[in-house]
Amino acid sequence: MTLEKDESRQDDALEACNAEAVARKAGEELNVFDKGRMEGPDAESTTHGTVRAVCVSKRKGTRKTVVDGPVTIEAHHGVAEDAHAGDWHRQVSLLAWESIEKARARGLDVKEGDFAENITTEGINLMALPLGTQLKIGDDVLLELSQQGKVCHKKCAIFYLAGDCIFPREGIFFVALTGGKVKAGDSIDVVKLGDGTCEYTPQEALDELANTPR
């Protein structure tokens, strides 16, 4: 091999490495709202999904029951007749079906509602959404993301019934800005990407999450 050809190959390799680095840097700088997760046909989106199930319980610390037909979400209160509804920042809880499937793959016998989520979602990457993000569900309901995960001070019935509780790590909470009906099959759309803050979330809740392993 001549010296000239060897230098040419080195230049080509260097150019390829530089191009790869530039492309990687550009990818890192893309906003997650625009990029989503588009690695394949089954990849989760950060902008759109669907309601897989709506679940309700009369008591806290228990599994929720999947409800057939539409369920009412009341503005600034939460899911009608659900134990977690009220005047606080965790009015409506969401958990991705993809998270439940991961638990099932580990051998847990779990389904929609078993981790006490109000709405089981499908197709949307909930964990990529920052605080303050607003979701429109169906025609009327508007929710704002107020908390990511939670702290379990003691293992509740859900942990013992399911063998683990993934909600503290992968569940998220919302306040209901507007009310309406929600049912399985409804669309979920990000209408506003949050800036990482939510006026409804008390500082002590954020401090507890930051200082407690889950």
Regions found by a protein language model. Give the residues of each.
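Short, structured beta-strand/loop micro-motifs enriched in basic residues and often containing a Trp
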Residues: 114-124, 164-177
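Conserved ATP-binding/catalytic segment of the ANL
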Residues: 174, 181-184
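Conserved "cap/hinge" positions at secondary-structure junctions
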Residues: 139, 186, 190-192
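Electropositive, beta-rich accessory/interaction domains or terminal extensions
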Residues: 2-149, 181, 195-214
